[in-house]
């Protein structure tokens, strides 16, 4: 697990930082107790698990079916990715 701090730059957003550091948006939010938009100069704590992978949701897949395949819970998948539901083509972190 790689752990470090990052200073938010002008134009940074949660989605872009999530992709840049391969960390789910939900994890960034919870690690940093975020309740508002990011501002330039904010310091974020980043924990990146190199084992984490990006997964594209397939046709007719649900959080439950994906959770069963990857030995996790639907709640964790939804929470880590800061979404209420999954849909075809959505890229999520597992």
Residue map of PLM features:
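Extracellular LysM carbohydrate-binding repeats and other cell-envelope/extracellular binding modules
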Residues: 24-56, 73-94
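Primarily a LysM-type cell-wall glycan-binding module
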Residues: 1-21, 42, 47-70
């Amino acid at each position: 697990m790689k752990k470090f701090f990052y200073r938010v730059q002008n134009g940074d957003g949660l989605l872009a930082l999530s992709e840049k550091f391969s960390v789910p948006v939900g994890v960034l939010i919870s690690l940093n107790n975020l309740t508002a938009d990011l501002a330039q100069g904010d310091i974020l704590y980043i924990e990146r698990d190199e084992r984490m992978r990006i997964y594209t949701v397939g046709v007719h897949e649900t959080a439950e079916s994906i959770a069963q395949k990857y030995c996790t819970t639907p709640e964790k998948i939804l929470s880590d990715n800061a979404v209420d539901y999954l849909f075809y083509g959505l890229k999520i972190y597992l």
